[in-house]
Amino acid sequence: MNHGTKIPVDPFRIIKETARDGSTGEVKQLSYTSSKVVGSGSFGVVMQVHLIESDSKAAIKRVLQDKRFKNRELQIMRIMKHPNIVDLIAYYYTTGDNSDEVYLNLVLEFMPETIYRASRLYTRQKLSMPMLEVKLYIYQLLRSLAYIHASGICHRDIKPQNLLLDPENGILKLCDFGSAKILVAGEPNVSYICSRYYRAPELIFGATDYTHAIDIWSTGCVMAELMLGHPLFPGESGIDQLVEIIKILGTPSREQIKTMNPNYMEHRFPQIRPQPLSRVFSRSVPLDALDLLSKMLQYTPTDRLTAAEAMCHPFFDELRDPNTKLHNSRNPDASPRHLPELFNFSPFELSIRPDLNQKLIPSHARDALPVKLDDFVPIPIHRARID
C-alpha cells in the first residue's frame, strides 16, 4: 500500500516541517529524525521519531485526507486532554507522490507498548497477567472512557491494540480516534464499526441507534482477554461472534433483543442456557472480577454499568489502598513501585457523577484535588462540538 511520500527512515537525517500546535493551533517549526515504522494498516502508517526541540520520542501517524470532509480524528484529538488519552503534540499536512493526495500527519505522544503486546508476553510464557495489572489498566481505560463519554464522544474501536502502555510506570493511554464520533440521539450511526471479538451484540444485530455502552462491552471483552490470555468471544463473522456470546451469556430474551434491534424480535435463536463465568475463568480469578465483568457484558445496553460506575466497583478497591505497590513482573529483582496517579481528577471529571465522588476518591488522595470535595459545586458538562 502506498502511503504517500515516505517518511525517510534515517536516524541521522533531520526533517523539518511547519506544523500547528495540537492544542492552540499556533504555527510552529518541527524538526525530527525518524527511526522506524511501528504500525501500518488501512488507515496509513505510524512512525517512531525523535523530536529535536524537546529531545523526546514521538509517533507520527500519517493518514490520507479526504478533501471532501474535515478529519474527525484531528478535530476530536484537538479537544481531548486527559492523563489516560494519548496527547496530540502537533499536526501538519503533506502531499503524496500524486499531488492530488493530501496526507494528514498527527504528531502524537510516544508510548513504548500496547496492552496487546503485554498480554502476549504473558501468554507466551503460559502465565496470566497479574491481577493488579489487570485492575490498573482496566481502571485507567474506564477513566478515559468516563471523560470522552461525558463529552459526548464514543471511541467505537476499543481493543488491546489501541491501548498504549508505559509498563515501567503502569500507565495506560487510549489511542486511535479514527473511528470515534460524537453520538447525537436520533441521528443514525454506521453499525459496521469496532473490531470483531470486541463488537457489542447490538452492532452485530445491525443497530444504528447505539450508545456509548458499546465501548463498555468492548472494555469487558478486553478485561476478559487479559485474564484468559485469549479473546472471550472469538469468531470469524458476525454470526460466529453471536454464537460465541450466546454460548456464555445464553440466548437473549425477546425483551433483550428489542433493546438491541427490534427488527430481530421474531428471529428464532437456539435456546441455550447461560454459563456461569466461574466456569469460563480459572479459580484464581476473584469473584469481584467476575461480578464486574457480568455487569459490563449485558445484552441490554442500558443494563451495562457506565464507565464512572464501573470505576467505583469493589474490584478496584486495591487501587484505592495507599499501601498497594506495583511489582515489576518482568524484572522480579526490581523493587516495588508506587501506583501511577489515579485520582488526579479535574473539575470536569468530578462533575461527571458528583454522587460517586466520595466512593471514587480515597481519603488519602483528597488533599491533592484542585477542589474541596465537601464544597465542590459541579460545573455544567458541555458536550464536545465539532463542525
UniProtKB/Swiss-Prot annotation:
Its EC number is 2.7.11.1. GO terms for biological process: cell differentiation; cell division; positive regulation of chromosome segregation; positive regulation of kinetochore assembly; protein phosphorylation; signal transduction; SREBP signaling pathway. SUPFAM superfamilies: Protein kinase-like (PK-like). It is an enzyme of class 2 (transferase). It comes from the Eukaryota. The modification Phosphoserine is found at S191, S335. Residues 32-316 form the Protein kinase domain. Autophosphorylated on tyrosine residues. It catalyses: L-seryl-[protein] + ATP = O-phospho-L-seryl-[protein] + ADP + H(+); L-threonyl-[protein] + ATP = O-phospho-L-threonyl-[protein] + ADP + H(+). It holds the Pfam family Pkinase. Changing Y192E: Delays formation of F-actin contractile ring. It is found in: Cytoplasm; Nucleus. SMART domains: S_TKc (SM00220). The modification Phosphotyrosine is found at Y192. One of its GO terms (cellular component) is nucleus. Keywords: ATP-binding, Cell cycle, Cell division, Cytoplasm, Kinase, Mitosis, Nucleotide-binding, Nucleus, Phosphoprotein, Serine/threonine-protein kinase, Transferase. The keyword Zinc-finger does not apply. Belongs to the protein kinase superfamily. CMGC Ser/Thr protein kinase family. GSK-3 subfamily. Interacts with cdc14 which is thought to play a role in the initiation and completion of mitosis. Involved in the positive regulation of mis12. This is Protein kinase gsk3. The lineage of its organism: Eukaryota, Fungi, Dikarya, Ascomycota, Taphrinomycotina.
